[in-house]
């Protein structure tokens, strides 16, 4: 039953329609009890061997006007192209470094000792978190470039307002990938010039300055090729999208307890996900 709902995508109503003689409330109760039994077991994750990279992202919820964040973590072997998800953690309040400290503290010690890097969005306190543990910090390219885009009818498109904004997007994209040398130096100088002048909205100007300030962390994957760092958190975000779809179709995310229960079971059914760090256009 769990596999058909959490992996095959059936809803309880669809499965119930094929079970004559059973009332729907009783069927839902049986399913919840099966979920509880499954989640109460020892976590089934097998930590990959060798040096590891920690991938992390948060999934936001709101209950009765109060923010909650489901913290997702996965471990990728430096020489591998897949990530193994750990059990999620749900904490009340906005996403931040203090709560990420709690999440990191829950990682099994035998895995913690082998983590050499972390890939995250550019959130306040992440530099300190990485430094405290002696980890290389790789900031997500996708989130950075997304700040230079906007939404229109569900699709991303480059912000309008003149060719300068398009130039900034192109320059930053190149600066994320170019090796050290004169071409990169010229691009960075141009970005510094634009950050001091009229480069569109204040938000875009701030994004350029933040990028220049954290440049080494966006380019960590180039400085540490032996770590096999992905330069996005896309694999973790893919899990987040799957969870959102599951909550939508099952209508199971009505309260914090339900979110954590279903998310834990869902992730345990899908422990591994491909992690390639695809390029961003």
Describe the role of every protein-language-model region.
Residues 69-70, 150-162:
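Short, surface-exposed amphipathic charged segments that create phosphate/polyanion-binding patches used
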Residues 20-117, 124, 128, 136, ...:
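RNase H-like nuclease fold core
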Residues 110-116, 120-132, 163-281:
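Acidic/histidine-rich catalytic cores and adjacent linkers
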Residues 11-21:
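DNA-recognition alpha helix
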Residues 1-11:
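Short, amphipathic alpha-helical "recognition" segments used to contact nucleic acids or chromatin
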Residues 1-2, 24, 263:
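Short, leucine-enriched amphipathic alpha-helices that occur as contiguous helical runs
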Residues 133-156:
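Inter-helix linker motif
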């Amino acid at each position: 039953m769990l596999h058909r709902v959490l992996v095959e995508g059936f809803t309880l109503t669809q499965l119930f329609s094929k079970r004559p003689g059973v009332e729907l409330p009783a069927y839902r109760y049986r399913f919840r009890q099966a979920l509880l039994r499954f989640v109460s077991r020892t976590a089934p994750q097998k930590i990959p061997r060798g040096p590891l990279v920690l991938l992390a992202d948060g999934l936001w919820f709101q209950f009765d006007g109060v923010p909650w964040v489901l913290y997702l973590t996965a471990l990728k072997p430096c020489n591998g192209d897949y990530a193994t998800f750990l059990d999620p953690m749900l904490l009340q309040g906005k996403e931040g470094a203090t709560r990420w400290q709690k999440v990191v503290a829950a990682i099994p010690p035998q895995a913690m000792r082998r983590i050499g890097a972390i890939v995250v969005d550019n959130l306040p306190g992440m530099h300190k978190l990485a430094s405290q543990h002696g980890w290389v910090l790789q900031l997500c390219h996708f989130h950075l470039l997304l700040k230079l885009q906007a939404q229109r009818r569900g699709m991303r498109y480059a912000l309008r307002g003149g060719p300068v904004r398009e130039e900034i997007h192109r320059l930053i994209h190149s600066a994320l990938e170019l090796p050290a040398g004169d071409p990169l130096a010229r691009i960075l100088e141009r970005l510094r010039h634009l950050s001091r002048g009229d480069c569109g909205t204040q938000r875009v100007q701030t994004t350029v300055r933040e990028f220049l300030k954290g440049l080494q962390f966006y380019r960590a994957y180039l400085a540490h090729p032996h770590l096999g760092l992905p330069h996005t958190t896309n694999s973790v975000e893919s899990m987040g999208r799957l969870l959102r779809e599951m909550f939508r179709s099952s209508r199971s995310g009505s309260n914090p307890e339900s979110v954590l229960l279903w998310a834990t079971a869902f992730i345990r059914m899908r422990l591994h996900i491909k992690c390639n760090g695809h390029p961003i256009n």
